[in-house]
């Protein structure tokens, strides 16, 4: 094995392939963040966490870097500017942020602070619209998607009265009647968009957000009926935006090109009917390479941001040239690409359950045959082919488990079976190599079987729900000690009392594996892991399984060559979570007091118990982050 180095650490955790220039390892073996991109100052993530802990924050902790949000937005705008220059496209471009991706004020507000025609906001519900109306600047583009009732439409029209460039996107035929009635009542001319349901389908975990099975959008017949209704009402000039959605996290750039070919036909045909379409909103789809493989895997993408922009601009440029049409302004809703990189969850390991090492127990006269067979196999390790020997050992191990279940082996011999089997497994693994093709399947099996369990102070369901819900992959890296070779392999489990509260796939060496190289814990020292690219959707979708709530969250902003912590938000406490599920806090306290009184303990002990109960009621929902001794 080659000597460990910082470059080896980068390669092991595939950092250059998913980091997009925002994350790296410094010479001291610490994960560093470059919030302004590859050329900007490097900030040690461990320093940020330690500073936040010193200011009263707790682990686990979500660390936000708002500068990354600005850099991602600038990169997206730059990619489209270059693509439009390449294809002589003069229609312009607006990057719209759909706040459903992450509605937190620090995220949406940071993005909304970027003024100009090149940025806008999208809402998909009444609460989101209320936030967008507050965040948007005069003249700012606001796209109103989602199901709409009369109040939603009224609020959107009020936005126009307040000077915002609000588009009400008709997603269902019934919405048009409400728009007509409310615009007349308010005395404001509506500006409309229409969402088409494309037949083209991009492969991926979210493929049904596009295509014929899409939840939203009009069919071709419904589009014709809508246009007729607008013309009959003298409102044909109100339709200014064509919207469609090809899917989310599209992995293959060819799927984007195919969807755009279909979408441009709708643009041309609507224009032929007399519609004056000024904006084409292509929705989302720009994916993130979570696993760093640059492939068509659902957790990856096989294209760059520049290639994505070109795949949008070129078909529209060609369509306009073919039909002799004015080039419309292009709008995207690439919220995942804007936000995923900006947030890192940092959590400490609370305990490690080591993989069984196995041992050869002392020989006993009363050993049953199954134990004796395993002992003999261990003695033959240097004399027989390793793969053949292991399969025979696995057979005897399974036989022993069956005998124990039938009551034909006692607990002592059951333990000896495990001791011998795992001793054989470790010895066989040491004799295998990936260079030998016939060894690879067994080596994969043993790498999955002979791993430690790292119990980490967080909840998968709260902080990374997509891991549980759709087998999403996120890069995971120790935030320090990367100058040391990791001596163990481990899997990660959370604090919840749920067998699904674990992570099964890990980014390693430009691939995915069932375990991750990790370090041994040191007594008295915290071992902290960073969970990267969690800035899109995860906080918003997180649930309160086992009543684990929001984690503490901080924002670290670049200042010169350093940083400052500009905001700190305390995570949920136990009383907040209990109140959320219907427990009256006064009733809880009264119940505790009654039970303490009924215990008839000495006054000083009763006081200590009441104090401990109150501390438990108002404390953080996660574990104390003190390192193990």
Give the residues covered by each predicted segment.
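Active-site-proximal beta-alpha core segment in soluble small-molecule metabolic enzymes
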Residues: 88-281, 286-291, 302-307, 315, ...
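Low-complexity, highly charged intrinsically disordered N-terminal segments
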Residues: 20, 25-103
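Charged (often Lys/Glu-rich) extended helix/loop segments that serve as interaction or gating elements
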Residues: 313, 317-629
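Secondary-structure-rich domain cores
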Residues: 64, 71-83, 91-93, 101-104, ...
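Short, glycine-/Ser/Thr-/acidic-enriched flexible segments
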Residues: 30, 38, 68, 102-104, ...
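A non-catalytic, amphipathic alpha-helix used as a structural packing/dimerization or gating element
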Residues: 67-75, 225, 262, 311
């Amino acid at each position: 094995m080659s000597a460990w180095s910082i470059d080896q650490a980068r390669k092991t955790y595939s950092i250059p392939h998913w980091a997009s220039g925002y994350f790296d390892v410094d010479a001291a073996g610490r994960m560093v963040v470059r919030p302004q991109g590859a050329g900007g100052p490097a900030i040690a993530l461990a320093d940020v966490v330690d500073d936040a802990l010193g200011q009263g924050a707790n682990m686990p902790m979500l660390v936000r870097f708002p500068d990354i949000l600005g850099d991602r937005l600038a990169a997206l705008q730059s990619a489209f500017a270059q693509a439009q220059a390449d294809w002589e496209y003069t229609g312009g471009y607006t990057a719209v942020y759909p706040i459903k991706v992450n509605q937190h004020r620090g995220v949406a507000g940071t993005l909304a602070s970027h003024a100009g025609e090149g940025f806008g906001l999208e809402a998909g519900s009444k609460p989101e619209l209320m936030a967008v109306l507050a965040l948007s600047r005069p003249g700012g583009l606001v796209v109103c998607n989602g199901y709409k009732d009369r109040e939603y439409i009224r609020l959107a029209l009020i936005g126009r009265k307040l000077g915002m460039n609000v588009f009400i996107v008709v997603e269902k035929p019934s919405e048009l009647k409400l728009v007509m009635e409310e615009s007349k009542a308010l005395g404001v001319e509506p500006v409309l968009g229409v969402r088409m349901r494309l037949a083209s389908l991009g492969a991926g975990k979210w493929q049904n957000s596009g295509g014929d099975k899409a939840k939203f959008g009009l069919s071709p017949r419904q589009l014709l009926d809508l246009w007729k209704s607008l013309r009959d009402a003298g409102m044909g000039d109100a339709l200014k935006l064509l919207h469609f959605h090809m899917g989310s996290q599209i992995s293959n750039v060819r799927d984007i090109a195919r969807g755009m070919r279909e979408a441009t036909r709708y643009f041309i045909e609507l224009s032929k009917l007399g519609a004056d379409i000024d904006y084409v909103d292509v929705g989302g789809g720009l994916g993130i390479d979570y696993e760093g493989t640059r492939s068509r895997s659902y957790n990856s993408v096989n294209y760059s941001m520049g290639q994505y922009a070109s795949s949008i601009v070129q078909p529209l440029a060609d369509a306009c040239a073919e039909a002799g049409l004015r080039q419309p302004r292009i709008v995207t809703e690439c919220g995942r690409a804007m936000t995923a990189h900006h947030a890192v969850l940092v959590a400490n390991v609370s305990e490690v359950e080591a993989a069984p090492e196995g041992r050869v127990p002392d020989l006993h006269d009363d050993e049953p045959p199954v134990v004796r067979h395993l002992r003999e196999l261990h003695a033959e390790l240097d004399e027989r082919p390793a793969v053949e020997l292991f399969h025979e050992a696995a057979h005897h191990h399974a036989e022993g488990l069956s005998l124990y279940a039938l009551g034909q082996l006692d607990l002592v011999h059951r333990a000896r079976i495990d001791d011998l089997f795992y001793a054989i497994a470790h010895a066989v693994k040491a004799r295998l190599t990936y260079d030998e093709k016939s060894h690879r399947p067994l080596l994969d099996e043993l790498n999955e079987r002979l791993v430690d369990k790292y119990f980490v102070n967080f909840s998968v369901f709260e902080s990374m729900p997509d891991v549980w819900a759709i087998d999403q992959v996120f890069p995971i890296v120790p935030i320090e000690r990367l100058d040391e070779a990791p001596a163990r392999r481990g899997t990660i489990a959370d604090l919840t009392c749920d067998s699904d509260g674990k992570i099964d796939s890990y980014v390693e060496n430009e691939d995915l594996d069932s375990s991750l190289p990790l370090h041994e814990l040191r007594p008295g020292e915290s071992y902290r892991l960073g969970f990267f690219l969690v800035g899109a959707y995860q906080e918003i979708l997180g649930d309160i399984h086992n009543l684990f709530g929001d984690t503490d969250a901080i924002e670290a902003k670049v200042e010169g060559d350093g940083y400052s912590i500009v905001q700190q938000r305390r995570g949920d406490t136990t009383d907040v979570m209990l109140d959320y599920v219907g427990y009256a806090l006064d009733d809880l306290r009264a119940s505790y007091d009654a039970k303490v009184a009924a215990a008839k303990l000495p006054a000083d002990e009763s006081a200590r118990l009441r104090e401990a109960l109150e501390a438990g009621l108002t404390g953080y929902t996660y574990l104390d982050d003190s390192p193990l001794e």
